[in-house]
């Protein structure tokens, strides 16, 4: 009996093709949903103060931290579950068991983070003196519980590379969240003012988050019951037997990987989200709100494009590179492994070219027009933020975005090819970097009083260190297959594009100046950016043609057959 007639794990071509088709749906839905979020948020930002945004952003960060620690190591590991049985229900149940493990992880994590927040968080002190703080806490806790309850189903769909369902479910949930937040804020504005409005506004965001989680829960649960009602897959922890009749709940090899990833995720969370922890202790509520708005507007491309690409790349590479562990009886393992290695390397070249050129365009357009665009988007509402340095700091955040992008894709590749030994070594490296980043951040933010500028510099150091480590490990991985990844070649390859970008920027500097200050200059910057895009496309046409053809031919082959 099969879990799903359309899913046949074990065929790397089908896996890759499924991943490519699925991620296209995921990217499209996420772009539409997040653009909708962006547009609807424009309707309410005029009513919100930096302190409201600071508190709500921090509460969302706490919820995401609990969810991250509870489930991320499992999400990274379930693709490694061995598909070593003809009974697809048996394999699916192994995956579901790991999803249940995420719920068990959550209880101690809830206790630790809850105690820490109640005793050491200045943001929570601010929340407790505001009206309606009790419903806020209840709604956020309930939303975390609901999202954890769907984790077994999420893991099953992820194992099957079924991005279609995820894109539909998340798109629906984001839409509901947007509508609830906008309507709640607009309604609260009619009946409350001053401090009471701030309390109700925070409660409105909590209600929106709860509606998001409830929608996800309903969609995943109904889908699971409809699709698997005739299969022998249980939504609970089931004791299984291996080929030697030994009973187990969790596949031992995969459980070892979960442990390795869990330790790694602790440090990754501190490094990735440590800026929010630092500013909660070193910055005022208003500064936190300013940084949240800047990050929200500045990273919209990262959230729309980079994040889906990173996740799909990690999943696809993991399935391809670990398929040999499920087919040890094949007569041509060496040929298959070498072929998979070259397939992933071609994809790596293609996506690196894309990321590099997109980063140049982001820097060229964002540094020049970013502050003006931010003012334009906020319109007459900008007066609420005049006392902050958000418009001066925004170009600095734009410079940070390429580091964020390359770190994300390289870590996705590294996690897909890492062994248990690699994960242990990476955990040690992350320990060292965590300590260095915390010290560096404290010195820049507090001692040198650079505030958010210091925070951005610390984040650049953080991402640069991780990029360097992942580059070294990825190069070492491919060198075993006699594929050379040379840093000198990368620099030589990058120089012409950087030179062209610099020349166009200098020309623009004489015509527009360092930053745009009016709509005419914004249009001129857009024209210069368009010219840069055309030139870069012409320059990269030959470089990207060969790897692009290899990747597309491989992925489209099942369709042609």
Curated annotation (Swiss-Prot):
Organism listed in the record: Candida albicans (strain SC5314 / ATCC MYA-2876) (Yeast)
Signal peptide (UniProt feature, chain positions): none
Chief location: endoplasmic reticulum
Known pathway: Protein modification; protein glycosylation
Annotated membrane topology: Multi-pass membrane protein
GO molecular function: flippase activity
Transmembrane feature ranges: 25-45, 49-69, 95-115, 136-156, 168-188, 199-219, 350-370, 398-418, 429-449, 452-469, 493-513, 519-539
Entry's family note: Belongs to the RFT1 family.
Function (record text): Intramembrane glycolipid transporter that operates in the biosynthetic pathway of dolichol-linked oligosaccharides, the glycan precursors employed in protein asparagine (N)-glycosylation. The sequential addition of sugars to dolichol pyrophosphate produces dolichol-linked oligosaccharides containing fourteen sugars, including two GlcNAcs, nine mannoses and three glucoses. Once assembled, the oligosaccharide is transferred from the lipid to nascent proteins by oligosaccharyltransferases.
Name this protein carries in UniProt: Man(5)GlcNAc(2)-PP-dolichol translocation protein RFT1
Keywords, ordered alphabetically: Endoplasmic reticulum, Membrane, Sugar transport, Transmembrane, Transmembrane helix, Transport
Domain of life: Eukaryota
Gene Ontology terms: biological process: dolichol-linked oligosaccharide biosynthetic process; glycolipid translocation; protein N-linked glycosylation
UniProt lineage: Eukaryota, Fungi, Dikarya, Ascomycota, Saccharomycotina
Xref: Pfam families: Rft-1 (PF04506)
GO CC, any one term: endoplasmic reticulum membrane
Compartments it resides in: Endoplasmic reticulum membrane
């Amino acid at each position: 009996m099969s879990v799903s007639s359309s899913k046949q794990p074990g065929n790397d071509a089908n896996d890759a093709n499924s991943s490519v088709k699925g991620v296209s749906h995921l990217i499209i839905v996420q772009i539409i949903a997040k653009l909708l979020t962006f547009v609807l948020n424009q309707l309410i930002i005029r009513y919100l103060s930096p302190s409201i945004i600071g508190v709500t952003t921090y509460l969302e960060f706490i919820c995401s931290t609990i969810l991250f620690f509870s489930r991320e190591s499992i999400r990274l590991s379930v693709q490694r579950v061995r598909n070593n049985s003809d009974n697809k229900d048996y394999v699916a149940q192994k995956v579901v068991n790991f999803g249940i493990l995420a719920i068990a992880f959550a209880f101690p994590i809830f206790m630790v983070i809850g105690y820490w927040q109640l005793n050491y968080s200045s943001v929570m002190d601010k929340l407790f003196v505001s009206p309606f703080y009790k419903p806020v806490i209840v709604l956020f806790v309930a939303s975390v519980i609901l999202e954890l309850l769907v984790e077994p189903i999420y893991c099953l769909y992820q194992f099957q590379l079924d991005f279609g369902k995820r894109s539909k479910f998340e798109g629906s949930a984001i839409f509901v969240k947007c509508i609830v937040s906008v309507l709640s804020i607009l309604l609260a504005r009619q009946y409350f003012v001053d401090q009471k409005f701030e309390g109700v506004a925070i409660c409105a965001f909590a209600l929106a988050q709860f509606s998001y989680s409830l929608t996800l829960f309903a969609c995943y649960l109904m889908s699971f019951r409809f699709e698997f009602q005739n299969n022998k897959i249980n939504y609970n922890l089931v004791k299984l037997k291996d080929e030697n009749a030994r009973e187990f709940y969790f596949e031992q090899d995969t459980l070892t990987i979960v442990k390795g990833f869990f330790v790694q995720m602790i440090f990754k969370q501190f490094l990735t989200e440590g800026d929010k922890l630092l500013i909660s202790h070193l910055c005022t509520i208003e500064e936190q709100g300013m940084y949240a708005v800047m990050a929200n507007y500045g990273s919209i491309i990262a959230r729309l494009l980079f994040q889906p690409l990173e996740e799909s790349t990690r999943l696809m590479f993991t399935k391809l590179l670990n398929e040999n562990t499920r087919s040890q009886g094949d007569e041509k393992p060496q040929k298959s492994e070498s072929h998979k290695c070259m397939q992933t390397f071609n994809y790596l070249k293609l996506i690196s070219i894309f990321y590099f050129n997109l980063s140049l365009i982001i820097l060229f357009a964002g540094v020049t027009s970013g502050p003006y665009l931010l003012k334009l988007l906020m319109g007459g509402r900008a007066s609420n933020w005049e006392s902050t340095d958000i418009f001066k700091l925004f170009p600095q955040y734009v410079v940070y975005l390429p580091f964020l992008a390359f770190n994300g894709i390289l870590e996705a590749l590294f996690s897909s090819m890492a062994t248990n030994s690699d994960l242990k070594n990476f955990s040690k490296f992350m320990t060292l970097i965590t300590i260095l980043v915390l010290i560096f951040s404290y010195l820049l933010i507090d001692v040198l009083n650079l505030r958010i500028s210091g925070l951005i510099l610390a984040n650049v150091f953080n991402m640069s260190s991780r990029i360097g480590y992942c580059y070294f490990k990825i190069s070492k991985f491919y060198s075993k297959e006699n594929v050379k990844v040379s840093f000198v070649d990368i620099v030589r390859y990058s120089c012409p594009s950087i030179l062209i970008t610099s020349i166009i920027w200098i020309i623009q500097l004489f015509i527009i100046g360092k930053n745009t200050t009016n709509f005419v200059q914004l249009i001129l910057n857009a024209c210069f950016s368009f010219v840069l895009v055309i030139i870069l496309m012409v320059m990269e046409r030959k470089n990207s043609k060969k790897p692009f053809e290899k990747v597309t031919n491989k992925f489209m082959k099942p369709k042609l057959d």
